[in-house]
């Protein structure tokens, strides 16, 4: 009897440790909203939208599409499945040429290792409505803590996580702390990354444990008052701005102070951290690009020197998304994953220092 019990236990352990997903595996699906969906500025009728465009008005058609996309959102869950898949129902889908389809329309899976570090596990896109997109197979059946990044430039009506029938799946409590809004350009949305988890806000989150709530809108972060309305309505502890990448020098001059004053009138006590825009590598030889970008940077620097003195709790920090060879760009404007890594690292110390000053550790 004792031998039989031992054999049964060993067989069960062997099954749990096996790294072979059955060829005829059947999947059981759970809606992501039944797990832990993180990265949202606020609740929305469609939980995969970032902004409720029925509530907030003033957006252009393109901006409406962008704020309904899921950039910066991720699902946290725990499972012992040997395989993980995703079944999606899509609305708008972007097919831009300067960004991998996996980033625009696909999913990016990270799993915590034994040291508690988030490690890349799988990424894939197939763009089919209701199709079962199998991200990974043949994992062991130990319990795993997972973080699945949603597409950066697609709208979803449903996102269902698939695990093999009989496996467990449940919500994972978020290890990320605080609620820090980040409003910005294509850089902040993650354009030109290879996969969703490689945008600089997502790299910053994994590196620091600080939760960033992304409102990145490619080409459309121009200090507009209606975006300020969204940020004011959000329950956040701090705000970070990639505010000088899209507007011209003249637009920065006209809009910066009214934008700051509008937000500060509603949220006077939270830190507002403005980042200088990065060096765009199109400037290496193109004189017109160099002149236009230099004018923006100089205007931002001049006005922010005044702003940090004029307004309480307003800060200005420098950024870097290039290496000494100036060779980290994908299209002359947006950095590659490598460039975004530099960006995330360049802001880590100053942002953490400012947050600590305001009791956000």
Describe each PLM feature range.
Residues 4-13:
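Sec-dependent N-terminal signal peptides
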Residues 9, 17-179, 354-361:
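N-terminal secretory targeting modules
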Residues 78, 138-141, 146-221, 225-232:
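Serine-esterase "nucleophile elbow" of acetyl-processing enzymes
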Residues 86, 183-184, 275:
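Short hydrophobic segments within beta-strands
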Residues 221-257, 262, 277-284:
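Oxyanion-hole/transition-state-stabilizing segment in secreted/luminal serine hydrolases
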Residues 267-272:
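A short helix->loop->beta-strand "cap" motif at the edges of active sites that frequently abuts
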Residues 280-318, 361:
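Substrate-gating cap/lid alpha-helix
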Residues 330-361:
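Histidine-centered active-site loop/cap adjacent to the catalytic His
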């Amino acid at each position: 009897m004792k031998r039989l019990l031992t054999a049964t236990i060993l067989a069960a352990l062997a099954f749990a440790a096996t790294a072979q997903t059955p060829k005829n595996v059947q999947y059981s699906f759970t809606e992501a909203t039944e797990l832990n969906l993180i990265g949202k500025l606020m609740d929305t009728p469609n939980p995969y939208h970032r902004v409720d465009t029925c509530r907030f008005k003033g957006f252009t058609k393109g901006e409406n599409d962008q704020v309904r996309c899921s950039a910066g959102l991720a699902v946290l869950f725990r499972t012992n499945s040997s395989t993980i898949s995703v079944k999606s129902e899509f609305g708008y889908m972007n097919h831009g040429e300067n960004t991998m389809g996996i980033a625009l329309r696909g999913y990016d899976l990270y799993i915590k290792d034994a040291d508690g570090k988030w490690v890349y596990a799988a990424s894939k896109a197939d763009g089919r409505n209701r199709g079962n997109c199998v991200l990974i197979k043949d994992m062991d059946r130990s319990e795993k803590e997972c973080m699945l990044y949603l597409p950066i430039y697609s709208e979803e009506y449903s996102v269902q996580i698939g695990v093999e029938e009989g496996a467990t799946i449940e919500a994972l409590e978020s290890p990320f702390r605080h609620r820090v809004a980040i409003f910005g350009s294509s850089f902040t949305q993650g354009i030109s990354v290879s996969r969703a988890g490689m945008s600089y806000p997502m790299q910053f989150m994994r590196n620091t444990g600080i939760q960033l709530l992304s409102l990145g809108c490619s080409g459309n972060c121009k200090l507009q008052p209606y975006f300020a309305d969204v940020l004011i309505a959000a329950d956040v502890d701090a705000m970070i701005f990639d505010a000088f990448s899209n507007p011209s020098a003249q637009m920065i001059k006209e809009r910066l102070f009214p934008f700051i004053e509008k937000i500060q009138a509603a949220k006077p006590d939270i830190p507002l951290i403005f980042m200088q825009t990065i060096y765009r590598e199109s400037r290496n030889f193109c004189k017109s690009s160099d002149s236009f970008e230099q004018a923006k940077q100089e205007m931002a620097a001049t006005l922010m020197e005044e702003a940090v003195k004029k307004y309480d709790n307003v800060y200005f920090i420098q950024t870097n998304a290039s290496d000494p060879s100036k060779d980290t760009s994908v299209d002359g404007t947006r950095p590659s994953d490598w460039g975004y890594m530099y960006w995330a690292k360049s802001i880590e110390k100053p942002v953490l220092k400012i947050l600590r000053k305001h009791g956000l550790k």
